[in-house]
């Protein structure tokens, strides 16, 4: 049984399988028609009711911030690619306490037709570094090309995705 997990668009709390501007909850069908988290409302951080981790798990669970993912980047090392309970993924081990995190990955076909494994995970806020509200949002990205030599690769980084695109959520529970 494969338990990769559900995929979400940014700011949506229901998982889905089709991702496009036309199906994105917070626009009128195009990138230029954002209806929430835009210049008019000035919001850059997900509200609780739009945080899938909080809505699904309740309590203090939430999606992580870009700062928290940067801490992960700085304080963990990639330890292995593996299959855990039928799900392919990647593990990272803390340089501080030795704890290990598993991130699921899924196959994805690129625009060139190549297949890679990807494990994009959303953060809870807009990329405040690039200006406008039409900019994509910071997810954490785990990616492995099928023919790529992974021994010298740093697969964990922050990039932009369009907010309608598919990504996992990796909930955090603040102390």
Can you annotate each of these PLM segments?
Residues 1-24, 28-51, 55-62, 66-175:
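C-terminal, surface-exposed recognition/capping segments
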């Amino acid at each position: 049984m494969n338990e990769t997990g559900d995929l979400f668009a940014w700011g949506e709390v229901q998982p889905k399988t089709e991702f496009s501007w036309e199906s994105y909850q917070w626009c009128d069908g195009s990138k230029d028609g954002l209806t929430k988290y835009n210049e008019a409302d000035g919001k850059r951080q997900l509200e609780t009711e739009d945080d899938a981790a909080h809505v699904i798990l309740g309590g203090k669970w939430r999606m992580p911030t870009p700062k928290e993912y940067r801490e992960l980047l700085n304080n963990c090392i990639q330890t292995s690619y593996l299959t855990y309970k039928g799900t392919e993924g990647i593990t990272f081990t803390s340089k501080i306490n030795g704890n290990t995190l598993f991130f699921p990955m899924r196959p994805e076909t690129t625009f060139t037709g190549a297949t890679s494994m990807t494990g994009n995970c959303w953060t809870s806020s807009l990329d405040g570094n690039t200006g406008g509200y039409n900019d994509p949002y910071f997810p954490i990205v785990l990616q492995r090309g099928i023919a790529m030599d992974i021994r010298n690769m740093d697969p964990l980084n922050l990039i932009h995705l369009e907010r309608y695109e598919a990504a996992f959520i990796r909930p955090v529970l603040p102390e």
